[in-house]
Amino acid sequence: MTMRSNKAIVNAAGQTITTAGLAAGGALNPEQAKKFIQQTFEATPLSGLVRHELRSAKTGEIDKIGVGRRLLRKKTENTDDGYRSGVKHGKLEYACTPVRLPWEITEETLRENIEGSNYETIVTNLMTRQIGCDREDLCLNGDERYAKVKEFSPSETYAIGDLVAYNKKVYQYTAAHTAGAFDAGEATELGTVDDADFLKVNDGWVKQFKEGGHVVDVSGINSGAMVLDVFYKGLRAVPDKFNNGTLRWLMSPHRRQEWERYILNQAVTAGGIITDKRVENPASVPVIEVPALPDDVIMLTDPKNLVVVNSYGVVIRKTTEGPEAIYQDKRFYVVHFDFDTLVEELDATAIVTGLASI
């Protein structure tokens, strides 16, 4: 079987990458990096709708330019009253975090799989798609607090809010813990250690919405069950100036189906006809189903208000050399890139919490 070069692997990762050969070491040139990143954005329903920024520097600022409202003034012939409207400038600071996705394929697999010589291409395409899915997951759910997780020790004391790892699971203490054996009654399980290693990369939009946007607790509305008032309360939390037809509900497929079940039950019990438009557009705002979004929140914003920043520093490497490759008869691959997740206007966001479990 003919060995494939770094360039061939990059071309397999994205069929749109057809520009000149790679620089040494698998680094993509700016045009290749742009096309590769674009392919990862196309892998998920939300990523293709958000704002993308490609920068040469890994840290920096993104300009925000805007104008105020009610700027018009009455004109008086042959008179300059000295009035001038202004332009509002702002900055979004970003700092891209490096991430990687490594994988390996044995030479035996390459020789004997049913896909034949296309196997390497198929796997690389799958990995490229997974990069897009994982990045969207991080953009939504990332939380840098998981970097503070420490292995539980019976000789240590822990305060409320501390994070510990125990039996490969992560817990947050809800009560102070004195030295002694681990007691699950003092803490809430948050996920696995692998989840924490993944989520600690960056702070995602869910966390940013909760810390700086409009938080709408609906636990007091029908015990958090899906009703129409949930959406209207969320919509009222966002200032009218942002309610200009570009807002979208972001929710998990399960949450979207729970809303559909509620509205159909209403039609059955109360009578009447529910159009698809009413199901698909609660409070006249379209829904975007986002598989990576947790079931316990609903987000409201213009997708273009969500920003993902990448640098051009994308590297795709493959090696068939070195002791491991020789002794284990394997090929090793890795994709390196970086990103940051921002919200341009937190005032233009709402997040609905306190929803009943489904």
Predicted segments, located by residue:
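Sequence/fold signature of self-assembling virion shell proteins
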Residues: T2-A20, A24-A43, E53, K58, ...
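Assembly/oligomerization interface modules of large self-assembling protein complexes
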Residues: A20-E104, T124-N125
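Intrinsically disordered or highly flexible coil/loop and linker segments, enriched in small
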Residues: L46, G132-E144, N244, V268, ...
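Short, polar loop/linker segments at the starts of domains and inter-domain junctions
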Residues: T79, I122, A181-T188, S219-A225, ...
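Alpha-helical scaffold segments that mediate packing/assembly in large oligomeric complexes
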Residues: E107-E151, S155, A159, T192-A237, ...
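Tryptophan-rich substrate-binding surfaces of secreted polymer-degrading and adhesive proteins
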Residues: K148-A196
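Short, flexible beta-strand-to-coil junctions
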Residues: Y166-K168, T174-A176, P253-R255, D302-K304, ...
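Beta-edge loop/turn motif
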Residues: G245-Q257
